[in-house]
Amino acid sequence: MNLFTDFEARIKTALEQIDLVREKRSELDFGRIAVEPPRDASHGDVATNAAMVLAKPLGTNPRALADVIIAKLKEDADVADVSVAGPGFINIRLAVGYWQRLLASIIGAGIDYGRSSLGEGRTVNVEYVSANPTGPMHVGHCRGAVVGDALANLLAFAGYGVEKEYYINDAGSQIDVLARSVFLRYREALGERIGEIPSGLYPGDYLVPVGQSLAADYGVRLHNMPEEEWMPIVKDRTIDAMMAMIREDLAALNVHHDIFFSERTLHANGAAAIRTAINDLTFKGYVYKGTLPPPKGQLPEDWEDREQTLFRSTEVGDDIDRPLIKSDGSYTYFAADVAYFKNKFDRGFEEMIYVLGADHGGYVKRLEAVARGVSDGKAKLTVLLCQLVKLYRNGEPVKMSKRSGDFVTLRDVVEEVGRDSVRFMMLYRKNSEPLDFDFAKVTEQSKDNPVFYVQYAHARCMSVFRQAKEAFAGLDVSPEDLAKAVAGIEDPAELQLVAKLAEFPRIIESAAQSQEPHRIAFYLYDLASAFHAHWNKGKDQPELRFVNDKNRESTIARLGLVYAVASVLKSGLAITGTAAPDEMR
């Protein structure tokens, strides 16, 4: 049961019973009616702007219309009180019986409470991480990995089919540089003294095992080949090794993709996929020969003061037209982007999400233009940019460097503070805002450490069940038993906790619609705070304790409330990819 959609329907039913509304129904936009929690909880449980948005088209005063709506709502047995505030907002306070039935429905649904049909089964392709396969993942990749994975989990919970994809950038010049770096390590494995790694090559020791494996398998044969012969062999071995390392890094973070798509497949068979994509755009009139004026500021790599084959992307929302084929006949990196999008669209995806680093901000408009041009506006593409993560230790910055070959890897962070701390904290800021990650703070056992605070709430819930079994020998209650006992939940403090649980379905849908998984982390912290606050009240008010060893019925009723809290915490934590522990030490 979704409290807010339920009362939205009830409010609209009440409106349909008003003569003036019925007379002008065709002129009214019920879609503008909002039903949500009031900003101040003391005003009620549900608030609506119905009178505010309908008064003008009805030719009446908002407060006067509110009074008429209120009269209808007072006929509802689940409404304990209803009033008008300010210029015409309507605040509704719900009856205890409604909260009890809602609690029973939460208990009945368990970890499926809050699941939505919002997506209506539509499949979304979420592409995230897509780090160049040039080495182990560093902490900079971590945020995009977590945001993309949590978003995919959220969309699945909201009723979407989801495919998680990783785009392997294995066709660019950086792969040639990587292969030459590995070939140097291969020569080293053969016993050659290579000295200092030349500037421009990858210096990391993580390439040593790849060189050793080539030496073991090929001996000196590669050494005696010209570069054009050994290059494809070394490339294949290196990319396989790097992607195996990246998969292990992602698994340590509990990130698993459905598809790993190789950029090289777009260049296979004479770049057939790229040629086809350009031909399709040509047929639609989006491709022409021309020379672009030099852009202001730093020149992009694909700019030439010569005639090129260009995508008329300004016609579909971009700032400038984009080169597809250079003057020498080679394809630009952007041409591969076009072919990749077409590949996704041809696979049947009409909704696609790209989770990219903040350094890709300049790609947003061109990717959106590609989506419009390739799909004729049928596909929806969203680009989410993840801002930088800054590492600290006790407030002091932690330096990270990749050029030197000595840098903070994703695995380093996970091994030091744990997967759960990394995942939850990467979601504890909106992806578009910079994130400070302090190794000391995320391992504190305090309210100031969100992941500990939320997980501790779940562990406390589980401890209540253990306490109940100690207090009442042989106590074994099913969710069905707990749902039948909700009449024992009537204290205002308990009902406030139910009200917080009632927000979860709305949070799920709003977070999915806005593609903001951080909202789940924020909500979980708020729910944990409400639960801990209620727990602490029991210290001073014994009548509010979850377990009353002298009252079995009261205990069972409150176990139902605890079960509901634990269920929502568990499903919310699952969306974030974080464990819900039964015990914490």
UniProtKB/Swiss-Prot annotation:
GO terms for cellular component: cytoplasm. One of its GO terms (molecular function) is arginine-tRNA ligase activity. GO terms for biological process: arginyl-tRNA aminoacylation. It comes from the Bacteria. This is Arginine--tRNA ligase. The keyword Cytoplasm applies. Keywords: Aminoacyl-tRNA synthetase, ATP-binding, Cytoplasm, Ligase, Nucleotide-binding, Protein biosynthesis. Monomer. A motif ('HIGH' region) lies at residues 131-141. It catalyses: tRNA(Arg) + L-arginine + ATP = L-arginyl-tRNA(Arg) + AMP + diphosphate. Its main location: cytoplasm. The keyword Cell membrane does not apply. SUPFAM superfamilies: Anticodon-binding domain of a subclass of class I aminoacyl-tRNA synthetases, Arginyl-tRNA synthetase (ArgRS), N-terminal 'additional' domain, Nucleotidylyl transferase. Belongs to the class-I aminoacyl-tRNA synthetase family. HAMAP family: Arg_tRNA_synth (MF_00123). It comes from Rhizobium etli (strain ATCC 51251 / DSM 11541 / JCM 21823 / NBRC 15573 / CFN 42). It holds the Pfam family Arg_tRNA_synt_N. Its EC number is 6.1.1.19. It is found in: Cytoplasm. It is an enzyme of class 6 (ligase).
